[in-house]
Regions:
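Beta-alpha junction/loop-to-helix N-cap segments that form part of ligand/metal-binding clefts
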Residues: 24-27, 40-47, 54, 59-133, ...
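Sec/Tat signal peptide C-region and signal peptidase I cleavage site
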Residues: 17-22
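Short beta-strand segments enriched in small/hydrophobic residues
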Residues: 25-42, 101, 170-177
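Venus flytrap/periplasmic-binding-protein-like
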Residues: 74, 120-122, 126-131, 208, ...
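Extracellular/periplasmic Venus flytrap/periplasmic-binding protein
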Residues: 79-80, 90, 128-129, 137-247, ...
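Segments of small-molecule ligand-sensing domains
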Residues: 303-316, 327-402, 406
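Extracellular/periplasmic periplasmic-binding protein-like sensory domains
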Residues: 243-323
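Bacterial N-terminal signal peptides
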Residues: 7-16
């Protein structure tokens, strides 16, 4: 009997120890896409995020709390994305936060995450009005939204012309992926066209965008001063090749940051030279954090990229930067709710809302120069709005501007108006940020 009691006590202690160990894991669902026409972006981005998670774990976790995750393949499909979210949201103690990397999926999850009280990040994409945290408590378009990016693009074109006033009478084509993603910047582009007197010509491209003959015939007839390429996946090299075929100078083309990766330009060959795109993070392997990933993650055989030469590429570093952001949000939550403890989704939401990634902190993380400072608040879930521009010279993207912003006042006014309209439609009472802790 005594032996049985000792055995039972030992089993109880072992079970308690196992439970305690399990409680020290922070679960993050990963709604990824590694197949289909957008696989290059998904595999690079999510590969970078997972590489950073592995680096954090190799360094002991977040104050001892290890990260754990599970992937679900969405194929960049809205309905599959929602299915993946529902499948993973309650696993392993519940989701910390969700990042779909798809405007369509993000729209599909907008009401669900609010109901489930799980924060959703839309890092550099998604619905721009979610920057108003008074209305969108659970959504975080952290960094720079499409509206802010569109405003920065017009500011950059204004610089090229010698001033925004020089855009008056110009013609700018918005060549866009015919989806929620491609349509998202149109309200801001329309407002800026009205303000500065340029003509905006909107030309949609059907998914996936590997046929653009009719669109480039329209562009040739329109004779625009500039073409904004708001593309994704195979649409981008197709557009660059078509521009060369129809004699449109790539120096007059300006791409969204999802049209500004190596995978977008290399397939286009010489047709891509001189092409400029936006960026909200910088590529490269020289950053200390990237060197640590190479040594501690890839050196240990745990690297997520199948093609190791993609380390430091634009999509890879962008994914690393997202990993930094979500890890720092968890760390911030621990400061308030318990250092070394597993955070709930609601606690991580607070962390996302009180991020302060200063230049000094970014340097401490080994990422100085990779991305601009980010500081979020209850009212501002974006926290930056900065963009830099880069030009492809045939071998690599070279920065042509520092991080810069566009018409922030116009964008914020439109964010507030759009969020207020959404709140009225959904019968949401905006939060009083003065009462938030």
């Amino acid at each position: 009997m005594k032996s049985l009691k000792l055995a039972l006590m030992g089993l109880a202690l072992l079970t308690a120890a196992s439970a305690a160990q399990a409680q020290k894991e922070q679960f993050i669902p990963i709604l990824s896409y590694r197949v289909g026409p957008y696989a290059a972006g998904g595999s690079g981005y999510f590969g970078g995020t997972i590489d950073y998670f592995n680096l954090v774990n190799a360094n002991g976790g977040i104050n001892g709390v290890k990260l754990t995750w599970e992937e679900c393949e969405t194929e960049y499909n809205a309905s599959k994305g929602v299915e993946c979210y529902e499948r993973l949201k309650k696993k392993n103690g519940g989701a910390t936060a969700v990042e779909p990397l798809s405007t369509g999926i993000a729209y599909g999850l907008l009401d669900r995450v609010a109901q489930d009280k799980i924060p959703m990040t839309t890092f550099g994409y998604g619905s721009a009005n979610a920057a108003d945290g008074r209305v969108f408590t659970w959504v975080y378009p952290i960094g720079t939204s499409y509206w802010s990016q569109a405003a920065a693009m017009i500011a950059y074109l204004g610089q090229k012309e010698g001033g925004l006033d020089k855009l008056k009478g110009k013609k700018i084509v918005h060549l866009y992926h015919d989806s929620a993603f491609g349509k998202e910047p149109i309200p801001v582009l329309d407002a800026l066209a009205a303000k500065h007197g340029f003509e905006l010509v909107k030309i949609p491209v059907a998914h996936p965008g590997n046929t653009q003959e009719s669109q480039w015939l329209q562009i040739r007839q329109a004779k625009p001063d500039y073409v904004i390429l708001w593309g994704w996946g195979v649409m981008n090299p197709t557009a660059l090749k078509a521009a060369a075929k129809f004699g449109y100078p790539r120096e007059k083309m300006l791409g969204v940051w999802w049209a500004g990766s190596e995978e977008d330009v290399i397939p286009a060959g010489d047709a891509a030279k001189g092409y400029t795109s936006a960026a909200f993070s910088a590529p490269g392997t020289s950053f200390p954090v990237m060197q640590d990933i190479a040594k501690k993650v890839y050196g240990a055989g745990k690297g997520n990229l199948e093609d190791k030469t993609r380390q430091g590429s634009i999509y890879h570093t962008r994914g690393v930067v997202y990993g930094i952001v979500i890890v720092e949000a968890i760390r911030k939550a621990q400061e308030k709710y318990g250092k070394g403890q597993v955070m709930t989704a609601e606690q991580v939401r607070w962390g996302l809302e009180n991020l302060n990634l200063s230049d000094a902190r970014i340097k401490e993380l080994g990422a100085a120069g990779m991305f601009p400072p980010i500081k979020t608040t209850c009212a501002d879930h974006e926290g930056s709005g900065m963009v830099k521009f880069q030009t492809w010279d045939g071998t690599g993207f070279k920065p042509v501007t520092p991080f810069m912003s566009g018409d922030r006042d116009l964008v914020r006014k439109m964010v507030d108006e759009s969020a207020a309209k959404y709140a009225a439609e959904k019968k949401i009472t905006p939060r009083d940020c003065s009462k938030e802790g």
